[in-house]
Structures are given as structure tokens and as C-alpha cells.
Design a protein with these regions (language model features):
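Q-loop/switch helix immediately C-terminal to the Walker
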Residues: 79, 86-101
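The feature captures the beta-strand-to-loop junction immediately N-terminal to the Walker
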Residues: 33-35
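Hydrophobic anchor residue at the start of the ABC signature
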Residues: 132, 144, 160
Length: 195
């Protein structure tokens, strides 16, 4: 839940987020829609604990997000190649995450031999599957998907979104989905918020 979030990139400049509040239930898939530059990604970074708001607060079950250890709010980034350590094999990257079971890998179509490769050796769609697996650790309660499929072909997009809808429903994980595509949000989300 976010309460009265205010954020500006520079003091005295127009705020990117001006007293934004929202809440997401554990079974909801909430779409965030808005043009470029309206603060969608900034809000998602704040909700996932990557960025601090100038004022306002983010909390889970009435408490602030943890400052260390595993965060139950996980973010999947737009550019998977920037989210993975290029010096680790993808198998090593998965081991850094929170208990990823093989069924999750199978559901995402992750081939066992991909885990011996490095991020630069896989396609964007293959790499995004690893980013999703890392974000879906056993302790994840909320998932933030920030334009995660815009660079993918339509078949891969469909596979990934269908998997995410099934997995988040099965595990009662709340999901925030950022997209410029209203059609995508209409298909995936239970409700939408326009910034």
C-alpha cells in the first residue's frame, strides 16, 4: 500500500508524483497506465523499495518494507539484460534468489541447459523468463511488472502473461502491471489506475 507519495527529481521542480495513494489486494492484478514521463516507473521503484519518496510511505501489512533481507515486493524490469549480473551464469543467478522450485522453471519454459549460460548468450525472451523466476521466490507477496513484454514477440508475450496470471492467482500474489498498452491491461488486470 502507498500513502500520499510525493516525489520530485530536483528540489523546486514540478513533482513527478504528487500525493499518490493506492492499495493492491493479494489477489488483484492492477494496471498502471499513463504516457511516458508521468512517473509510472518511479512509482514502481518506490513501491518496491528501490527509491525513497520525498514524503509519504509504503507499507505491507501496516509495516514498512524490510530494509534488509528478502523483500516480499519484487520488481521485474523492462530490460532483463540490465537486471542480471553478466559475470554469473543464469543458474548462479537463480540460486541467489529466494527458493525457486523446478516447477516454476518448467512453467516458464526455462530449459535446464540455459542455466549453464551467461545472460549475453540468451535472447531477451529467454532472459526475461529468468528475471520472472527470480522475482517469484517463495516469500514473494507482490509482483511489479514494469513494461516487461514490450520487446518480446507476441507468442512469448502470451506465454509469459498467461503464466503470470495463473501463478499469481494460484499463490494469491498481488500484481501491479505497468504498460502503455490499454489492450494488454484490459486483458490482464482486474482494475486499472491512470497516472
Amino acid at each position: 500500500e502507498a500513502e500520499d507519495i510525493f516525489f520530485s527529481y530536483a528540489k523546486g521542480q514540478k513533482p513527478v508524483l504528487d500525493h499518490v495513494s493506492l492499495s493492491v489486494g493479494p489477489e488483484e492484478r492492477v494496471g498502471i497506465l499513463g504516457p511516458s514521463g508521468y512517473g509510472k516507473t518511479t512509482l514502481m521503484k518506490i513501491l518496491a523499495g528501490y527509491q525513497k519518496p520525498d514524503s509519504g510511505r509504503v507499507f505491507l501489512d501496516g509495516r514498512p518494507l524490510p530494509k534488509s533481507g528478502y523483500c516480499p515486493v519484487q520488481m521485474i524490469w523492462h530490460h532483463p539484460e540490465k537486471a542480471m549480473n553478466p559475470r554469473l551464469t543464469l543458474g548462479e543467478s537463480l540460486k541467489e534468489a529466494d527458493n525457486i522450485d523446478r516447477q516454476l522453471e518448467i512453467g516458464l519454459g526455462i530449459e535446464p541447459d540455459w542455466k549453464t549460460r551467461y545472460p549475453q548468450e540468451l535472447s531477451g525472451g529467454e532472459l526475461q523468463r529468468f528475471c520472472i523466476a527470480r522475482a517469484l521466490g517463495q516469500r514473494t507477496r507482490y509482483l511489479i511488472a514494469d513494461e516487461i513484454s514490450t520487446m518480446l514477440d507476441l507468442i512469448t508475450q502470451g506465454q509469459i502473461w498467461n503464466f503470470l496470471m495463473e501463478e499469481t492467482a494460484r499463490r494469491q500474489i498481488g500484481m501491479l502491471v505497468v504498460s502503455h498498452s490499454k489492450d494488454l491491461l484490459d486483458y490482464i488486470c482486474t482494475r486499472q489506475i491512470k497516472l
